[in-house]
Amino acid sequence: MLSTLSIQEKTVLYMNGVTKSFDGFKAINNLNLVIKPGELRAIIGPNGAGKTTMMDIITGKTRPDQGDVYFRNEVDLTRHSEAEIANMGIGRKFQKPTVIETLSVFDNLELALAGKRRVWDSLFFALPDSGRARIDEVFDIVGLGDRRHILAGALAHGEKQRLEIGMLLAQSPELLLIDEPAAGMTDEETAQLAELLKDIAGERSVVVEHDMEFVRALDATGTVLHEGSVLAEGTLDKVQANERVIEVYLGR
């Protein structure tokens, strides 16, 4: 049941007392997290801290053993399937791009825009003017307008990452979960991506899982996880000065 605090404050994501064990190992241990509308939040933590399991729980891939997970204050995500949660407005991008490389950049966005329609319908029926206008908007946001007619497989790694973010944006999500988007990027691509994520936050909430240096580029609130719980939260300078974070994350 939602707490008084969460009812009084509008939230996009509310997690309270969430726990998940696998064969006796607590991957998530009494996790509490609140994401507000339009917030850009960075999730930080070493391997095994619980970041992936947390995102799996939010998207319905994994069910928690206990705790509350609510979307928009009122939707109990633990009662819905992955597909239902995606259709509600929660999008997830994994670390490795999953664009269809044999289709053009435009066609990838068209397929994403189709949403509930079948791929066959998307490929063989004309896109309405409203759909084309939405795709043009997404091209403006992700900066790939001049690449729309080339095959997605010909894009650079950073461009593929931006295309996949665009594919999520085409579906107009309220909450985006993004897994290590800058992995394998050049410094220039990383800077461009940080600006993109800052731009798209505001109209929607964005949760980015990444390392501390990329979080600095985002200028976002950071939440540090350790052993499935929140270890520290605040600005990057604040969490980096936290003695427990220094001990656990930086290994000093």
Language-model segments: which ranges?
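Glycine-rich phosphate-binding loops of nucleotide-dependent enzymes
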Residues: L2-R252
